[in-house]
Regions:
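Amphipathic alpha-helical coiled-coil/rod segments that serve as protein-protein coupling scaffolds
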Residues: 2-127, 141-145, 151-153
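Local beta-strand/beta-hairpin segments that build beta-sheet-rich folds
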Residues: 23, 132-133
Length: 153
């Protein structure tokens, strides 16, 4: 899902892992910085919405007594709608960045035994890379239904 440098291998070859168990930790400093930056931008956008909301309330009273023009009120209302859209956009960007941060920890898709480690600490993995990072061998019980005639007994 994301690319980066492998900081830690969180298992030993030949050990049993459960589905969802963390296997690798990518360097997440960039992802953390992105989340922090986008969170600050979101707070600025929310503050702008609050400012424009207060201004609109004031302008609503002023436009009724012709103290300001209808055009000025409409412009402020348009700015307010744009600011609300900016907040929604920043929430989506922040959500995506938080997801990227979560994906910096690579988990096992299935339970099984780690058969082979294909990347080591310090390796660079790319987003969309189709190569496996480790081989998890699923070791399950196998049940066989066999029909046997009484004469073969």
């Amino acid at each position: 899902q994301v690319g980066g440098i492998v900081d830690k291998v969180l298992f030993k070859q030949g050990t049993y892992v459960h589905a969802g168990q963390p296997l690798f930790k990518l360097n997440s400093e960039i992802f953390q910085a992105d989340v922090k930056s986008n969170r600050a931008t979101l707070h600025r956008a929310e503050a702008e919405v609050t400012r424009l909301q207060i201004l609109l309330k004031r302008y609503a009273e002023l436009v009724t007594v012709n103290a300001i023009s209808k055009q000025e009120y409409n412009n402020t209302e348009a700015e307010y709608q744009k600011a609300k859209a900016d907040v929604t956009q920043m929430e989506a960007i922040l959500s995506r960045q938080q997801l990227n941060l979560k994906y910096a920890t690579i988990t096992s898709p299935i339970s099984g035994i780690i058969g082979e480690i294909l990347v080591t600490e310090g390796a660079l993995v790319s987003q969309g890379d189709t190569k496996a990072m480790a081989v998890v061998q699923q070791i399950d019980k196998v049940y066989i239904d066999e029909k046997q005639s009484i004469t073969d007994y």
